[in-house]
Amino acid sequence: MKFYIKTFGCQMNVNDSEKMAGILQTLGYTPTENWEEADVILVNTCSVREKPDQKVLSALGEFKKVKKHNPNAVIGVCGCLAQRAGYEIYQKAPFIDIVFGTTNIHHLPNLLEEAKSGNKAIEILEEIDENENLLDQFPTVRENKYTAFVTVIRGCDKKCTYCIVPTTRGRERSRRIGDILREVQYLVEDGVKEIHLIGQNVTAYGKDFGDVKFWELLKAVAEVDGVERIRFTTGHPRDLDEDTIKVMADLPQICEALHLPIQAGSDRILQAMDRGYTQKEYLQKIELLKKYIPNIALSTDIIVGFPGETYEDYLETVKVIKEVEYDQVFAFKYSPRPGTPAADLPMTESPEELSKRLNDLINLQKDITFKKNLEYQDKIVEILVEEINQENKLVGRTRTNKLVYAEGSPEYLGKLVNVKIEKVNRFSLEGSIIGGD
């Protein structure tokens, strides 16, 4: 029996899908890259913007075809969209067999058994399942052998007016350090070199416990023998403190890269979003980061066209981009999410104007990214070789999260090696291996 999982959305969803794959393998299923031959198809959904919603329904329409030659195939929908609108999805696609949300993934074996018995298995919990940590006991099935996501906190207590995540993922719930370290140890023994700590608001880790802080978790993970690199995503600017930044600077395992979403540069819009900081306060965090970690590579998220945004507000965002000089910016037009406070606010600019602002912003960032990449020309950088591509190039990332294609021997796969950068592109670097461990 075979399974296929289609994943939309963030790293948390990717990690959830890895856990689902682990559950299915435990049940005797094997993965397939061809959904047409799958006995179980799961669609792990995202609800952060409208476009992923549409993609999910399109994918389901395609997957429906599997039932023609395999009537007993099970099709399931899970994740954030399922948590928010699972019953609506089922009404639109009644051929679905399973629907479940974000906190009861560990119920998948029971739901699958119910569906295989010929029943519809729909379980969307209004409250967080008190046994959701049982999910962490299952192995992950990863595409990447040498890097791994580790969920350290679930949910978000922030109430940003545009965001559906607190509704779909619930309040913040941290995992105990001991549980996290056991998972990290298992991953290292499985060959993982780089640990990527993730959460909807990873820098809030431990606040619900009151007896442990995020920087203490970073130190503990760094002490696990065999952990060569540590990254973490995504933090909220309000929860990033100087103690954490100092630990980032002090621990050699922590990579010099950080994703710190600003969302908008205008204080008026930031207040309307209920982000809890001003432009000045955000830039003070950036200043601290650059003070302690001068070579840090920064990335951010930006929403263009939040209700009420004027051109002057937009220019404040442009000003921040120019001042910070991010290595990467993930920018999107505002997408109203049903059930959020901002969804009731009227749009004040035309779609054409918002598209122009977004395109101008993206083009500005492309130039900044290329300028930042040019600094790597003829430099020697460390990469973790993660794979070999179809052109027989080694593929890896620098500590600053730059994608590198390198000439070198396959023996370097899974190793930290030095690469001399010989060519700089807008979104990647190219070079040759000059040594390895």
UniProtKB/Swiss-Prot annotation:
Binding-site residues for [4Fe-4S] cluster 2, renumbered to this chain: 156, 160, 163
Annotated residues for binding of [4Fe-4S] cluster 1: 10, 46, 80
Pfam name, any one: Radical_SAM
Co-factor requirement: [4Fe-4S] cluster
Cofactor note as given: Binds 2 [4Fe-4S] clusters. One cluster is coordinated with 3 cysteines and an exchangeable S-adenosyl-L-methionine.
Domain MTTase N-terminal, chain residue ranges per copy: 1-117
E.C. code: 2.8.4.3
Subcellular location, principal: cytoplasm
Highest taxon listed in the record's lineage: Bacteria
Residue span, Radical SAM core domain: 142-371
Any one cellular-component term (Gene Ontology): cytosol
Ranges where the TRAM domain occurs: 374-435
Catalytic activities: N(6)-dimethylallyladenosine(37) in tRNA + (sulfur carrier)-SH + AH2 + 2 S-adenosyl-L-methionine = 2-methylsulfanyl-N(6)-dimethylallyladenosine(37) in tRNA + (sulfur carrier)-H + 5'-deoxyadenosine + L-methionine + A + S-adenosyl-L-homocysteine + 2 H(+)
Transmembrane portions of the chain: none
Gene Ontology terms for molecular function: 4 iron, 4 sulfur cluster binding; metal ion binding; N6-isopentenyladenosine methylthiotransferase activity
Keywords assigned: 4Fe-4S, Cytoplasm, Iron, Iron-sulfur, Metal-binding, S-adenosyl-L-methionine, Transferase, tRNA processing
Location of this chain's protein in the cell: Cytoplasm
Assembly mode: Monomer.
Cited NCBIfam families: miaB-methiolase, MiaB/RimO family radical SAM methylthiotransferase
Biological function: Catalyzes the methylthiolation of N6-(dimethylallyl)adenosine (i(6)A), leading to the formation of 2-methylthio-N6-(dimethylallyl)adenosine (ms(2)i(6)A) at position 37 in tRNAs that read codons beginning with uridine.
Family per similarity comment: Belongs to the methylthiotransferase family. MiaB subfamily.
Protein name as it appears in the record: tRNA-2-methylthio-N(6)-dimethylallyladenosine synthase
